[in-house]
């Protein structure tokens, strides 16, 4: 199948997907990661303006790994991305979860607030609203358990004090246990473009 990674960074995920047999394309806003994708993996990653050059309804999967929260013009980007998906194509969004246990624990020190580069903080109900608005079906929500440890470590850096690694490991563990399988520090939303979608 055909896969687009929007916000592909330095190309690690694209390279993995290609090794699994996917025909891959990448879009990345920053010049340096695009160059790194070329030098490390021989991937031709394009700037966001190249989205218009992709044929409508031609892609099976579009991934956005921790990207949507950085997008200033949310509606325009979502509409543009969805227009490239085939009917029943899948959109995969990885996003920080402001309702997670570690977000509530760290409060204003929670690293995933990441202001000012995060324009949005999506709760599950926000993704459900976007799905409804843009003709998508929310198929599944998955935890990203390792993010709880990473975000806790960054958050401990903001809090200050001693034993940051130990505290972060403990808080990350507790956050994952308390998540109940569906409320970790970061969540992956798997959405399907409905036959009547954009």
What residue spans do the PLM features occupy?
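Short glycine/proline- and charge-enriched loop/turn segments
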Residues: 106-115, 154-161
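N-terminal start-of-chain detector that recognizes signal peptides
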Residues: 16-18, 92-93, 111, 159-165
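Conserved glycine-rich, hydrophobic/aromatic-active-site segments
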Residues: 118
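Homeobox/homeodomain signature
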Residues: 44, 109-112, 164, 177
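Conserved SAM-binding loop
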Residues: 1-107, 121-134, 144-146, 185-193
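A C-terminal cap/extension of S-adenosyl-L-methionine-dependent methyltransferases
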Residues: 140-198
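Short acidic/polar active-site loop segments enriched in Thr and Asp
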Residues: 137
């Amino acid at each position: 199948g055909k896969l687009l990674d929007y916000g592909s960074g330095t190309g690690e995920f694209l390279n993995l997907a290609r090794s699994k047999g996917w025909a891959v394309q990448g879009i990345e806003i920053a010049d340096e990661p695009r160059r790194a994708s070329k030098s490390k993996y021989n991937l031709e990653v394009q700037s966001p303006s190249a989205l218009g050059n992709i044929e409508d309804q031609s892609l099976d999967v579009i991934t956005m790994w921790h990207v949507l929260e950085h997008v200033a013009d949310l509606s325009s980007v979502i509409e543009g991305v969805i227009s490239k998906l085939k009917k029943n194509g899948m959109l995969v969004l990885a996003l920080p979860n402001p309702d997670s246990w570690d977000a509530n624990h760290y409060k204003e020190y929670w690293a995933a607030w990441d202001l000012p580069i995060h324009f949005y903080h999506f709760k599950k109900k926000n993704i459900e609203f976007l799905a409804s608005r843009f003709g998508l079906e929310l198929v599944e929500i998955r935890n990203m358990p390792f993010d709880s440890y990473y975000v806790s470590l960054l958050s401990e850096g903001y809090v200050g004090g001693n034993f940051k690694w130990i505290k972060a490991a403990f808080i990350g563990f507790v956050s994952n246990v308390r998540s109940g399988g569906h409320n970790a520090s970061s969540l992956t939303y798997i959405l399907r473009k409905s036959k009547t979608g954009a």
